[in-house]
Design a protein with these regions (language model features):
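Bacterial Sec-dependent N-terminal signal peptides
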Residues: 1-22
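Primarily marks secretory-pathway-exposed extracellular/lumenal segments that are disulfide-
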Residues: 5-6, 405-409
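Compositionally biased, low-structure terminal segments
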Residues: 10-13, 24, 315, 360, ...
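Single-residue recognition of alpha-helix boundary sites
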Residues: 13-14, 285, 340, 433
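Prokaryotic Sec-type signal peptides and long signal-anchor helices
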Residues: 13-16, 241, 318, 417, ...
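Conserved beta-strand/short-helix segments
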Residues: 20-404
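C-terminal outer-membrane/trafficking sorting elements
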Residues: 409-420, 424-491
């Protein structure tokens, strides 16, 4: 009987990630500090326990100076790591863009900073020294007035950063450009020349993504190469001396698609491209296309992933933790109310992109999904910049973790212990497999709060009920110096 139950449990654990794909919120909402902060405009998770959140209109040190807050998960709640990272001066709007290659490094864009020229913009990189965020090197300033450098940033590692300045005029008015910098142990030094937009008004650099130090994808969402404002994306690789385009332009499908408004590369041979203005499924429903490199050309992987309804603007934000998983935001979707917003996760099943889970914004006008970040296939952060729970348009961010990663998390028992069913409606069977000396059973919730604790004498089987609402629970079984922990879903 025990072998059968164990086999059932193992088989269930194997098929569960394909079949259920449910996610539960990890901790409480992370609210913006004050009204009109628009916290959650940008989010980044370098791993499942760290998140950076931009509030580019925060007034903490000056009017609309902006700030970024980094949080760490302690097992039960999100705790701020260090102080706020504030912008330099009035109207800097620091935090519009950010990226974290690891949990101790962050690049932050302040696209209206006037350090070099008015609205030239700049980027600052910070390192965590164990107790505070310390700037690494000097500001990386934009080239000229109104460049808006720092509108987009991407860091594949702690010593490389790509910076988009979408209004730079080096190749024509508002053609835009991207610059890549590397750290030489003393300062940030440009790697290669500017990567300029193709023609005037392209706004190249509106989006940028680097999966590694030698590859970069650049979105120019107002390029007219395909047709008027269809947009395009170009991918470049470093040949040792210069940035060289890899393959042809990836053009948007139709006029006013704004393809390239969002891009993300999980690796050097995969790119996801958002076109929030695409009308394939309805006016401005939006779509996302994923492409792979076959050695010669960029080939679309599967068909278009279309927005659900008119004006959803699906594809406004994108995150790919790997080549077969994609999260995308539809910040104007009406799932729970007008412009409440949505985010969606899709998985490649070998032949098509399959919807795994959807996340609705909390309230009307939240614009949830304006930013998304997935550090892995089981965790997602979603920004809702107009949420007003802590003040009008203060914004908030929610983090969700997959409820499908169930089963044994830790054990040093020599014999097999089986807990079933999982998921459960509340009733649990615990088969210890052998008589154990005075086992103690402790149930805690996702926030580390103890829900139930029971002690037993010399038993090998028991039944108990999980009190409390549906959610994720942890069952700890102790007997002497032995311990095992199960992750259980209560439906």
């Amino acid at each position: 009987m025990n072998k059968i139950l164990t086999l059932i449990f193992v088989l269930f654990a194997l098929i569960m990630p394909i079949a259920a794909q449910s996610f539960l919120q990890m901790g409480l909402d992370i609210d913006g500090e004050a009204a009109e902060d628009e916290s959650g405009t940008s989010v980044c998770m370098p791993d499942g326990n760290t998140i950076a959140i931009g509030a580019y209109l925060n007034d903490g040190s000056s009017l609309n100076v902006g700030h970024v807050r980094i949080y760490s998960w302690n097992g039960s709640e999100w705790l701020q790591k260090g102080d706020d990272i504030d912008g330099e001066a009035d109207q800097d709007r620091l935090g519009w863009s950010l990226d974290m290659p690891d949990n101790n490094t962050i690049a932050i864009g302040a696209y209206l900073n006037d350090g070099s020229e008015i609205n030239s913009g700049h980027v600052r990189i910070y390192n965590w020294n164990g107790s505070a965020w310390i700037q690494k090197g000097a500001d990386i300033d934009g080239e000229a007035a109104d460049d808006r450098s720092g509108w987009s940033v991407s860091m594949p590692d702690a010593n490389t950063v790509a910076i988009g300045a979408y209004q730079n005029g080096g190749n024509g008015n508002d053609a835009g450009h991207v610059r890549i910098y590397v750290w030489n142990e003393v300062a940030w030094i440009q790697k290669g020349g500017d990567i300029d937009g193709e023609v005037a008004e392209d706004l190249s650099g509106h989006a940028v993504s680097m999966p590694d130090a030698n590859t970069v994808a650049i979105g120019a969402h107002r390029n007219d190469g395909g047709t008027y404002h269809a947009g395009h994306v170009r991918i470049y690789f470093w040949d040792g001396l210069n940035w060289v385009q890899k393959g042809a332009d990836i053009d948007g499908e139709a006029a006013d698609d704004y393809s390239g408004s969002a891009v993300n590369m999980p690796d050097a041979n995969t790119v996801a491209i958002g076109a929030w203005g695409n009308d394939g499924n309805d006016l401005n429903a939006g779509h996302v296309r994923v492409y792979t490199w076959d050695g010669v050309t960029w080939t679309q992987k599967g068909i278009d992933i279309d927005g659900e309804a008119a004006n959803d603007e699906f594809g406004y934000s994108i995150s790919m933790p790997d080549a077969n998983t994609i999260a995308t935001g539809a910040h104007r979707a009406d799932g729970t109310g007008l412009d409440a917003g949505q985010a969606h996760i899709y998985k490649w099943d070998g032949s098509a992109w399959m919807l795994l889970s959807s996340f609705d914004g909390e309230l009307v006008g939240d614009e949830s999904g304006c930013s998304v970040s997935m550090p892995n296939a089981n965790t997602i952060a979603i920004g809702a910049r107009y949420n007003s729970n802590s003040g009008y348009h203060a914004g908030h961010t929610r983090i969700y973790s997959s409820a499908d990663e169930v089963g044994v998390l830790e054990t040093n028992f020599s014999n097999t212990i089986v807990v079933y069913p999982n998921p459960t409606k509340g009733e649990l069977n615990i088969d210890l497999g052998a008589s154990n000396n005075n086992p103690t059973i402790t149930i805690t919730n996702l926030w580390g709060q103890q829900i139930l604790k029971t002690k037993h004498n010399d038993i090998n089987y028991l039944q108990l009920t999980i009190p409390g609402p549906a959610g994720i629970y942890f069952i700890e079984i102790r007997s002497g110096d032995k311990k095992t922990i199960f992750k259980i879903i209560k439906e």
